[in-house]
Amino acid sequence: MALVKVKPTSPGRRGVVQVVNASLHKGKPFAALVEAKSGNAGRNNNGRITVRHQGGGHKQAYRVIDFKRNKDGIPAKVERLEYDPNRTANIALLCYADGERRYIIANKGMVVGQPIMSGSEAPIKSGNALPIRNIPVGTTICCVEMLPGKGAQLARSAGTSVQLLAREGTYAQIRLRSGEVRRVHVECRATIGEVGNEEHNLRKIGKAGAMRWRGVRPTVRGTAMNPVDHPHGGGEGRTGEGRVPVNPWGQPTKGYRTRSNKRTNSMIVQRRHKR
């Protein structure tokens, strides 16, 4: 994997920095693990925008990823590494001893031919998935479940990882990249190591059109809108907000807490905000 600065043959190419990985598979994905993916342009079932700045972009196919890692005791080998347009991390195609194939999130340092195992008896090696009760304290892990058997939800993006801090009874404490310390059940599964493609954040897109290819639409300032469209809108000429900065729905944007799931507050030992 390397960072390549593109030759400035045009204004759109000037400044572009790409992440090049020669080990990625250059053909089509494994057909049995590919599903159709329809875009929703950030709209919900009522047709209203719930996520701004989404729409358009190149047509994508969804790769079915095995986030549960529940094929225990059967050894597998990494058949190939692939690019996945649906996430920042790369993915790996595993071929199990019984012939089944599954996609997983590719770990840092994962290579073709590497042996992979899942289950409580799996060795503590990068890429193997185990219940947290079988992982030594202090180990760097990724793809962590929040509920046993639900599938990985934490630390799935490129270059991310979680540190296992302690185990007390039926719960373990983990530190997320944000600094938050959280409790998870010891039966939750996690993958040893950290997610690969760690140089993803060092790339430079170069032009607006490249973001449109990815399905990202422009972000318009609230002060440039009309009053009917945004609380910051209106006024003659260029004007400031004239109030505490808010989003289009009037909710404060500077440090205002929006977490509403009070049911799991007890699982957060230390918030990412130290205040």
Curated annotation (Swiss-Prot):
The keyword Amino-acid biosynthesis does not apply. InterPro entries: NA-bd_OB-fold, Rib_uL2_dom2, Ribosomal_uL2, Ribosomal_uL2_bac/org-type, Ribosomal_uL2_C, Ribosomal_uL2_CS, Ribosomal_uL2_dom3, Ribosomal_uL2_RNA-bd_dom. The keyword Cell membrane does not apply. PROSITE patterns: RIBOSOMAL_L2 (PS00467). GO terms for molecular function: rRNA binding; structural constituent of ribosome; transferase activity. It holds the Pfam family Ribosomal_L2. Residues 229-241 have a biased composition (Basic and acidic residues). Residues 221-275 are annotated as: Disordered. Belongs to the universal ribosomal protein uL2 family. Part of the 50S ribosomal subunit. Forms a bridge to the 30S subunit in the 70S ribosome. This is Large ribosomal subunit protein uL2. It comes from Dechloromonas aromatica (strain RCB). The lineage of its organism: Bacteria, Pseudomonadati, Pseudomonadota, Betaproteobacteria, Rhodocyclales. The gene is rplB.
